[in-house]
Amino acid sequence: MAAERTQNLQDTFLNHVRKSKTPLTIFLVNGVKLQGVVTWFDNFCVLLRRDGHSQLVYKHAISTIMPGHPVQLFDPTDEVASEKA
């Protein structure tokens, strides 16, 4: 039996928007608005790319992340199946 690795919601979200190249608006705690696509992230920072330029943003400075379009992280049919079991 293979061990199932669980990811936290933050990593799941960032990985999804990175892979799908979803455009984001990121608001920092000081009110600054950044826009771009996540190209890389780790436990401490996010690399945001826009118009050929990259910005390294520390996660502790991020207040809110808004994707440009709705993001579905989990399959709702899986939840229905697990509730019936």
From Swiss-Prot:
Coiled coil: none annotated. CDD domains: Hfq. One of its GO terms (biological process) is regulation of DNA-templated transcription. RNA chaperone that binds small regulatory RNA (sRNAs) and mRNAs to facilitate mRNA translational regulation in response to envelope stress, environmental stress and changes in metabolite concentrations. Also binds with high specificity to tRNAs. Seems to be involved in the regulation of NifA. HAMAP family: Hfq. PANTHER family: RNA-BINDING PROTEIN HFQ. This is RNA-binding protein Hfq. It comes from Azorhizobium caulinodans (strain ATCC 43989 / DSM 5975 / JCM 20966 / LMG 6465 / NBRC 14845 / NCIMB 13405 / ORS 571).
